Amino acid sequence: MMCNCCHCHWRRRCQRLPCALTLLLLLPLAVASEGPNRCDTIYQGFAECLIRLGDGMGRGGELQTVCRSWNDFHACASRVLSGCPEEAAAVWESLQQEARRAPHPDNLHILCGAPVSVRERIAGPETNQETLRATAPALAPAPAPVLLAAALALACLLGPLA
């Protein structure tokens, strides 16, 4: 299921934006209207989280770097929501659950949430650091088009407000 971004002149990219991400971007509006002065800076906070996520993704396409940025984004978003009503945390969690179920090959919840297993190479009776090798799922290219779409959707949403 896809959402349309009707105010955006980058319509083709916005049409590819998953609804879960659109809801994530609309979360600040819903939360800000819920409580008195507890979420005054939620737009600024989420914008800063998204900018940091984009900056982190731009540092390199290695899965470890991408996942570190992704995990930092979630920690940042949680800090932004910490001063908001409890309903905001429930919405955030439901968005994360929906995103985890999305059957996209570049789903960061799946790529970054996969456990890293350690297997031992059989090299003799001794076990040391050289005989242990971490394995993880095959590296996938960084989902730059999805991040670009997220940034464009945010610009679409914030554009009429400015």
Curated annotation (Swiss-Prot):
Residues 137-162 form a propeptide. It is found in: Cell membrane. GO terms for biological process: neuron projection extension. It comes from Mus musculus. InterPro entries: Neuritin_fam. GO terms for cellular component: axon; extracellular space; membrane; plasma membrane; side of membrane. The keyword Transport does not apply. Keywords: Cell membrane, Glycoprotein, GPI-anchor, Lipoprotein, Membrane, Signal. This is Neuritin-like protein. A lipid is attached at A136 (GPI-anchor amidated alanine). It is a lipid-anchor; GPI-anchor. Belongs to the neuritin family. Residues 1-32 form the signal peptide. GO terms for molecular function: identical protein binding. PANTHER family: NEURITIN-LIKE PROTEIN, NEURITIN-RELATED. Coiled coil: none annotated.
